[in-house]
């Protein structure tokens, strides 16, 4: 009789590509020794659309509808970064009212993005209920977006020198009501999730990133702040009107999946604080640069004719990008979203390099999952928070 032999071969498993509503078209080739992860290789590129090359033969305004397809769950941020560059190159002043409207839209977009991170993250861990709860609040945010911009997603709302339209009548009151309601929703999430022993068992001490490690990998956003580094571009770069509001940077020391969860949950309440202050202190005046110039002019009949009201007003002025280099960045929900642009005395940029936070944060995944269990891969991947449109571009 032959003695039974135990196989020692490593097993290779394909995880993904998954449905776009979860982690998108990310494929992981995982090498397993039993339940333990030996190696993990992310395969990217399934959603590559050549966004950087498209930018090189479009004016900024023509390119705006494309940028909402990078991170399609936080489209206000991609629009903001696209128009911030030309504004700095051309030294274009943004009216105070427009800046406040931008801040409100950006923070609503941040909350919507974090909500759609929370639902699938909890579903990955095995908690199905929060997945349905988050859509309730997210729908209210999309209603606000639809009332202000005409679109639930892909808003195309930002313009060089301001925004496309003023806030409609009654919108501010509706938004304040949402803020009051949403704070109770966050408290409900805290009660349901944060102290849940099963949840804590799945995330505590899983996927730990040290302070130095986070810096060396170039991580940003909640991934960086969860590792004990108090770095938020809204405080560092002083862009838009963030200096005028009272709010705190959310950060944790532990660097594990639980810390990343706590940072994002904390950011939602801080965003509500910013929105409430902006809504209560929003100044009057023009909502875009063209309107501001109009107010400064004498009463001239040319401003009231058909062409101005229906044609000239809609696209922002197309101007040549001067021959210089510029790097602009904003604090997006997933981290530092940046653009390195080179002008060439043309209406088209000569080079348009995107720095997507999701792509850079994803690089640390193979190191985090090594020597972990197979079930921990989804916990760690979920805590990183990636959108493949932004990763592949």
Curated annotation (Swiss-Prot):
GO terms for MF: NAD binding; oxidoreductase activity, acting on NAD(P)H, quinone or similar compound as acceptor; quinone binding
Keyword Nucleotide-binding assigned: no
Domain of life: Eukaryota
Keyword Plastid tagged: yes
EC number, as in UniProt: 7.1.1.-
Chief place where the protein resides: plastid
Gene Ontology BP, a term: photosynthesis, light reaction
InterPro entries in UniProt: NADH_Q_OxRdtase_suD, NADH_UbQ_OxRdtase_49kDa_CS, NDH1_su_D/H, NiFe-Hase_large
Membrane topology according to the record: Peripheral membrane protein
Its job: NDH shuttles electrons from NAD(P)H:plastoquinone, via FMN and iron-sulfur (Fe-S) centers, to quinones in the photosynthetic chain and possibly in a chloroplast respiratory chain. The immediate electron acceptor for the enzyme in this species is believed to be plastoquinone. Couples the redox reaction to proton translocation, and thus conserves the redox energy in a proton gradient.
Name of the protein in question: NAD(P)H-quinone oxidoreductase subunit H, chloroplastic
Lineage: Eukaryota, Viridiplantae, Streptophyta, Embryophyta, Tracheophyta
The gene coding this protein: ndhH
């Amino acid at each position: 009789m032959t003695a039974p032999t135990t196989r020692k071969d490593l097993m290779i498993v394909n995880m993904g590509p998954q449905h776009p509503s979860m982690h998108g078209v990310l494929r992981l080739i995982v090498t397993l020794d039993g339940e333990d992860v030996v190696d993990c290789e992310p395969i990217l590129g399934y959603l590559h659309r050549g966004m950087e090359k498209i930018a090189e033969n479009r004016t900024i305004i023509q390119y705006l509808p494309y940028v909402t397809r990078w991170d399609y769950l936080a489209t206000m941020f991609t629009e903001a970064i696209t128009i911030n560059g030309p504004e700095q190159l051309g030294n274009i002043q943004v009216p105070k009212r427009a800046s406040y409207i931008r801040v409100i839209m950006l923070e609503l977009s941040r909350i919507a993005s974090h909500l759609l991170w929370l639902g699938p993250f909890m579903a990955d861990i095995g908690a199905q209920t929060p997945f349905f709860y988050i859509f309730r609040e997210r729908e209210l945010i999309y209603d606000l977006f639809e009332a202000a911009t005409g679109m639930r997603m892909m808003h195309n709302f930002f313009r060089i020198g301001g925004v496309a339209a003023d806030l409609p009548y009654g919108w501010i009151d509706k938004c304040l009501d949402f803020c009051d309601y949403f704070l109770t929703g966050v408290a409900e999430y805290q009660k349901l999730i944060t102290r849940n022993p099963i949840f804590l068992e799945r995330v505590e001490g899983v996927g730990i990133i040290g302070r130095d490690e986070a810096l060396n990998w170039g991580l940003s956003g909640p991934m960086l702040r969860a590792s004990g580094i108090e770095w938020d571009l809204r405080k560092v770069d002083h862009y838009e009107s963030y200096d005028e509001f009272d709010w705190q940077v959310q950060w944790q020391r532990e660097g594990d999946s639980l810390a990343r969860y706590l940072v994002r949950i904390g950011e939602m309440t801080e965003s509500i604080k910013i929105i409430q202050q902006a809504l209560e202190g929003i100044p009057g005046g023009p909502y875009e640069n063209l309107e501001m110039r109009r107010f400064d002019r004498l009463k001239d009949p040319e401003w009231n004719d058909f062409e101005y009201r229906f044609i000239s007003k809609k696209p922002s002025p197309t101007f040549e990008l001067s021959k210089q280099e510029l790097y602009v960045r904003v604090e997006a929900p997933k981290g530092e979203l940046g653009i390195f642009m080179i002008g060439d005395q043309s209406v088209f940029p000569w080079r348009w390099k995107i720095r997507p936070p999701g792509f850079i944060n994803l690089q640390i995944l193979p190191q985090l999952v090594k020597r972990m269990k197979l079930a921990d891969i989804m916990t760690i991947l979920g805590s990183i928070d990636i959108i493949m449109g932004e990763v592949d571009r």
